Amino acid sequence: VALLGVMRIRWHAGAILVLLGLVLLAVSSPVEAPSAPPESATYAILISMDGARPDALQAAGASWLLEQASYTLKATTVFPSVTLPAHASMVTGLTPRNHGIMQNDWRPGMPPIQVPTLFDAAKARGRTTAMVISKEKLRALARPGALDRVEVVGGRAEVVAERAIALLTRERPGVLFVHFSDPDSAGHLHGWMSSPYLNAIARTLAAVGRILKTAQERENGTFLLIITSDHGGHGRIHGTRSPEDMTIPWIALGTHVLRGHEIQQEVRIYDTTPTILSALGIPQPPSLEGKVVSEIFF
């Protein structure tokens, strides 16, 4: 009887050790979601709709775009919620305290951003880079040697789209940044969510659609296209911590991007660069604060 009791104790102890080992194995070997598409994208397009609120996209009829995309209408920008600091976060993967741009002012002769950007990382891997912008101050994002082409285009969204499409079809950059100022201009002049503002959103969406169509019809290449904004607005201003100013759309489309998928993870404006680098197969600099929005890929 005593021997039988000892055997039972040893059996229970052994079973406990086996179970403990299985638990430790499960903890040390988690099943992780993929952080990148199975095939690196040939090129990436980043589109900024300056001053575009998510509810404005819905009001202007953006359902056709969301049906093709992985998206969230609850992404957040950085504070201060103004153009230059927010765009710097968009293309660096950093918050303003770490990329150093806190002011919304830049003029020719002033130094550009001092930290590496998406364009630096792409160039280091042999990708060509280009920027089509409708605000001169966004030249602050162009570090020496990081961009092969920078075009400042005056005029409405249609004109900006024409230049972007020309670059896509002729020069085929590996990373293209396109900036539309129409929503922001209409918001300051007429008020956010006013009829002229919503008309500007609709025009810009149509221009975005032309760029998307060009990417979808382009042969010999896979792509990632991200559409987002630097800030929202209320009344005729922005720059505060209010939800109307801080909430932005974040929309991804591409060869290996899920369609009609509402993103569940939290998305910040500075997640944009890590996600693009991941799609292009470019290693993430360890300094990045942003995270890859991995759930968009299949």
Walk through the language-model features, giving the residues of each.
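Short, structured active-site-proximal loop/turn typified by the sulfatase FGly-forming signature C/S-X-P-X-R
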Residues: P54-S89, L94
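Active-site-proximal N-terminal segment of extracellular/periplasmic enzymes that hydrolyze or transfer
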Residues: V31-S70
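Structural recognition of the beta-strand scaffold that forms the well-ordered cores
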Residues: A44-S48, T72-K74, S89-V91, T128-I133, ...
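Substrate-binding rim/cap in mid-to-C-terminal beta-strand-loop elements of soluble/periplasmic
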Residues: H87-V91, R241-P283, S294
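Catalytic-site neighborhoods of secreted/periplasmic enzymes
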Residues: H99-I101, M110-V160
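Bacterial Sec-dependent signal peptides at the C-terminal "C-region" and cleavage site
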Residues: A13, V18-S40
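Active-site His/acidic residue clusters
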Residues: E136-L147, T169-R210
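Metal-dependent active-site segment of extracytoplasmic phospho-/sulfohydrolases and closely related
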Residues: I45-L46, G61-W64, A200-P243, I276
